[in-house]
């Protein structure tokens, strides 16, 4: 085991806080309509320009191991918020920094960290309850477009494209974002999404996004388990000869079969991925039949008398693009016969009418939505590759924000909801003075996003926060784009309730862990690493 370095108490927290500030100060300059861009150097290709908080956070790795612990913990806030809400990562980072900074000051002043955390948790619960009570449902497509425009830093065209895509496939429909040429456009294609992802991370083709993307893809559908691919070798060779990529969908793919596919992918002989079939029992068989109709495949099943050794290339289904995450698979522009798909849809509709079971009806309606809904594809354009990448980041953030708004409604935006929800903490007391201090930490910290939005617009954040707090209206706030005060809802400045809620929950959770940390244990650099660090320091002098 390699040697470790240990830091205690104030020294440990001080080093962590320095790392927290380095990461948060880098990320928070992107917040709000007048937030600035960050340029990321890449190991290959052109630099990347972005205003996406989680993208910036993921790039930060500090050389000091103890500072890096703090930075990585706050990076976890951004990642968790992005995973749960899809947006609000910069807000979560700003909140985490504010809570951690105030909390560590209180610990340094001799307060009990555990009581501070109890006070923080109590205050957060009340603020979130208040945010929920302020929330109102999203109305029509125009309001969805407003949410989108705000998330896209005021670019109304992006908001309209998201609203248009949702109008075509439904608010719960599948919407995929891709790169294109000069113009951004939206198209609905035949496709389906199901809730099973890749069976091995070795199939991943885009490490940064942790996804598998297969183009011009052949699809093998198998009803049973695959444990060996010996009988499939001629088929695999035929797929390679046809210059196709391959998706294998089966009840399970394990043992030698999974190993064979992974090795083929890693050696570059065949671009391939495997996923479990969706559903359970009879539902799985029905879903596989839906997939077969949609992709034009023959379902390989002992009941149907088809065996792996007899499968030929023309028995596989096809899709122009397949995208797999760890949790889902999307088939885009699949090659099934339109008449067969329409017939299958009619069959499912008849089953919905005939069934008396509420559970069966729900499952049939899910299948119908998957088959009939299609996939909306937003193709993002721009004059240069750098512009396309930056624009795609914003479109993906916008899509996530609008989905969140549809799920839980919206609240006044621009940091106003947190400020007004914080008024519910007036008069709240803990069980002791240290818990009271934890409550005060949250009262101050929830002002941080509004302050930062104002600072990024070149206006004193303290003055702006003070004016918003003084106003009794729960919808009163600051429009950083126009540098005016007014009703946020009337101005169309709204945030998804889910994004605000999760940003605060995740920030308070991680900051609470940081405040209650007393010891950090880190890997001690080897001699070569120490010499390298000394050389870097020498070069800076």
UniProtKB/Swiss-Prot annotation:
PROSITE patterns: CHAPERONINS_CPN60. It comes from the Bacteria. Its main location: cytoplasm. Transmembrane segments: none annotated. It catalyses: ATP + H2O + a folded polypeptide = ADP + phosphate + an unfolded polypeptide. It is found in: Cytoplasm. GO terms for molecular function: ATP binding; ATP-dependent protein folding chaperone; isomerase activity; unfolded protein binding. Forms a cylinder of 14 subunits composed of two heptameric rings stacked back-to-back. Interacts with the co-chaperonin GroES. This is Chaperonin GroEL 2. It comes from Cereibacter sphaeroides (Rhodobacter sphaeroides). The lineage of its organism: Bacteria, Pseudomonadati, Pseudomonadota, Alphaproteobacteria, Rhodobacterales.
